[in-house]
Amino acid sequence: NSLDNKLVIDEKVAGTKLKVEGSGEIGDKILAGKATLEELAGTAKVGDKTASDEVGTQDGIIAGKMSAKVGDDGKIVASTVKRAIQQHNQAVSSMANLSLMTWRQENNDMNKRLGEVRASEGSQGIWARMARGQSKYGQQGIKNQYNYYQLGYDSKISDDWILGGAFTYTDGDSNYTNGSGTNKHTGFAVYGSNLRDDGSFIDLIAKYAHMKNDFDVNGGVGSGDYSTNGLSFSAEYGKRFHQEGYWIEPQAELTYGRVSSADFTTKNGASVHQDSMDSLVGRLGFSLGKDIKQGNVYVRASYLYDFQGDTSVTMSKGGAATSFKTDLGGGWWEFGVGTNLDLGHDTHFYLDVETTAGGDVDTPWQWNAGVRYSF
């Protein structure tokens, strides 16, 4: 643990190799510029000469493992220096990115939120929905299983427009190599939907949420918790074309989201700074459906692309610091199947199941169910 400790060797047999390995604490000091690999090599001596042929350090709180070869002159051979990533801290970085991942997953089109609102009668409506799913991300094999709840009310303010609001709550449990975590969002949304007789619609929604995250990592900076805030604004346009009981509905949507920065200290005393994260997701897609006596059934497909999505997490302690950059931007596909059913008595039920493919964040499954009562 200390460079003051010395290994004095009386004689080194020809052909033998000696490796001196320092603790993670020494690795952190080297990363902070308070010590050097050459000083570590010099802790083993034969007479007044360095006996080390190779040096290395274990994982520190901030620094990953280091290694290097030592020349005959006792100096480090620069071309052999290797610095590994502290895997536990990379997991913490990935956990911090869950805020953006889960916030982006809460983006939803009008049909997911309200079901077949066109079929609703009455000037007002109350509705509730729940979504449950799983997402996967990163080299650490992070799996986040989440539940998403909304409770809303809306009212017609004209022949074409309805205006409403909703309370939202999300809770998730994540697991990954050497750790686990939880994430919770509490917030609200306001929306306006324009539904026209020609089958076209415009849907506008703004959302806010307060996010709480905690993680427990075996090693590195250790465990911690923090809070941040998320905002998003979305606009969607679509038009339904009917033909003999079947219909197709092209859709286009643009969503901007932002998760604010956060600063916190872990249980191991490390300071962590998470940069703010921006997301700008464009979506082009369609749904293809068939009208049935009780409502309709449909399949849908969309291509989504996040034009932003990059962020970084910086961890530091005692002058040692490391940063992890992540880019969640890029495109992915979304496929779904669902139904909207008239249960009678001004009540409608809707169910949707989806999966994604081709993106950095994979959602193998998610189901979404809701009920709406109009009066």
Predicted segments with their positions:
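Outer-membrane translocation/initiation segment of Type V secreted surface proteins
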Residues: N1-D10, A14-D159
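Membrane translocator/pore-forming domains, dominated by Gram-negative outer-membrane beta-barrels
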Residues: N89, G122-G125, R129-F375
